[in-house]
Amino acid sequence: MILLDTNVISEPQRREPNAHVLDWIDAQALETLYLSTITVAELRAGIALMPVGKRQDSLRENLEKHLLPMFANRVLSFDMTCTKAYAELLAKSRAAGLAVETADAFIAAIALANGFTVATRDTGPFEAAGLNVINPWEA
């Protein structure tokens, strides 16, 4: 199972999406792809922070009416098991002298707690957490 980082799931919505990422997504069995509640929050925040207009409306509609329904029952929450993985990840990162962004640490903890691979462009923090990582930009 693969947990999609925000940069992967948002790539198809870019004005000029990366062809490698689109091909990689198309090659995956949909039922193996998951989102986290952290990614959903980042997507919603990104849209909310955009200038008001047609692009914002279009992205919001696509997210709420198409993307999220496509991932129904495949959105992982940050639960009590994840809190332990998060604490261990932060301690391990600090001991190694690494800084991990808060959202990445939450997503990594969700993946660790559920035994998932992470698909992301920003591989460093997830590899440092000991996760299996796929970079669709290079796949």
From Swiss-Prot:
It holds the Pfam family PIN. GO terms for molecular function: magnesium ion binding; RNA nuclease activity. It comes from the Bacteria. Its EC number is 3.1.-.-. Its cofactor is Mg(2+). Signal peptide: none annotated. SUPFAM superfamilies: PIN domain-like. Mg(2+) binds at D5, D104. The keyword Magnesium applies. Residues 2-136 form the PINc domain. The keyword Hydrolase applies. Keywords: Hydrolase, Magnesium, Metal-binding, Nuclease, Plasmid, Toxin-antitoxin system. Toxic component of a type II toxin-antitoxin (TA) system. An RNase. Involved in plasmid stability. Belongs to the PINc/VapC protein family. PANTHER family: RIBONUCLEASE VAPC2. This is Plasmid stability protein StbB.
